């Protein structure tokens, strides 16, 4: 958790809960220390998702969640753009890559994982 000395950061170079909460970014990472090693999770957004790059909800307890519909929650009611109506038979697909790591990856390493994910993505769902 961030309270115990962990770090939250995103693809924009922002760091810390206050700067990353509500930020729109291609990825968000939370890394902390457990005993003598660093561990964490990186969540990577896909360009085909609604509202890419997504808005992120993070907190000091280590919560990290994508929120593609959080425009007005994070930018205020006047921002608009967070409402989406889906037709009854419409299919909505959201793709994210989750990387659980037992290290403290650099921002460049996470960016490379993001680029590999978006360049090689081909998923077929029947």
Predicted regions and their residues:
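Beta-strand-rich recognition/accessory modules
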Residues: 44-126
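Trp/Gly-enriched beta-strand surface patches
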Residues: 3-79
């Amino acid at each position: 958790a961030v309270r115990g000395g962990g770090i939250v950061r995103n693809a924009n170079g922002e760091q810390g809960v206050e700067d990353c909460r509500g930020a729109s970014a291609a990825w968000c990472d939370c890394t902390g220390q457990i005993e003598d090693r660093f561990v964490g999770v990186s969540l990577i957004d896909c360009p085909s998702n609604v509202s890419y790059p997504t808005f992120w909800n993070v907190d000091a307890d280590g919560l990290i969640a994508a929120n593609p519909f959080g425009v007005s929650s994070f930018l205020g009611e006047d921002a608009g753009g967070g409402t989406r109506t889906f037709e009854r038979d419409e299919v909505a697909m959201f793709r994210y890559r989750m990387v659980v790591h037992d290290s403290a990856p650099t921002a460049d390493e996470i960016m490379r994982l993001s680029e590999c994910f978006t360049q090689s993505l081909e998923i077929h769902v029947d």
